[in-house]
């Protein structure tokens, strides 16, 4: 997951109380933008961001991007996680945001090794073994963080160029395609066994 800011200035929270929404619940204090109705607020590392999140699934050996998805920033990372799994992987490496018991069980049922970092909670601290496991998984996850660094630093995805989720999703897919083409050009040719 990586937060991407929209091309417009984020709206400020409203000063007046608002009536309940159509579902009867109180409206969010952080309103949506009138110019970009698909963008939403999120909080990451103590900072608030308004915009979108990019999610990618890559091949561990070649660093080829296999799946990608753009969501609004309010979507939890666990929601699009299953869409990033192609199904033919031997193992899935992911950070703590993707850790769910159902996901681990689903991966095992599909004969995929779940290498998801363990998440501590207020009732149970991580054991030393789980901490070592998280360190090992963190080292294997480095290629996906490099993809995000390239998307933001070289391709300018730190800020969304377009208004709307669909246009930004298309832009993300085109950038991933460009990155894959550049990556394929430097990969060694696959050995053919007869």
Task: For each feature predicted by the language model, list its residue ranges.
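Short, charged, surface-exposed secondary-structure boundary motifs
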Residues: 79, 102, 123-130
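Polybasic low-complexity intrinsically disordered regions
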Residues: 1-109
């Amino acid at each position: 997951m990586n937060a991407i800011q929209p091309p417009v200035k984020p709206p400020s929270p409203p000063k007046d109380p608002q009536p309940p929404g159509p579902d009867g619940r109180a409206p969010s204090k952080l309103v949506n933008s009138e110019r970009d109705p698909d963008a939403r607020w999120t909080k990451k590392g103590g900072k608030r961001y308004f915009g979108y999140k990019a999610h990618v699934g890559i091949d561990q050996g070649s660093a080829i991007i296999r799946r990608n998805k753009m969501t609004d920033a309010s979507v939890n990372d666990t929601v699009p996680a299953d869409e990033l799994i192609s199904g033919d992987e031997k193992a899935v490496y992911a950070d703590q945001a993707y850790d769910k018991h159902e996901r681990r069980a689903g991966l095992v049922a599909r004969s995929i090794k779940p290498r998801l970092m363990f998440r501590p909670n207020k009732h149970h601290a991580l054991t030393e073994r789980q901490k070592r496991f998280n360190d090992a998984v963190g080292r294997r996850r480095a290629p996906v963080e490099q993809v995000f660094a390239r998307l933001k630093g070289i391709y300018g995805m730190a800020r969304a160029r377009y208004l709307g989720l669909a246009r930004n999703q298309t832009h993300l897919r085109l950038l991933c395609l460009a990155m894959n083409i550049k990556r394929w050009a430097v990969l060694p040719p696959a050995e053919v066994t007869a």
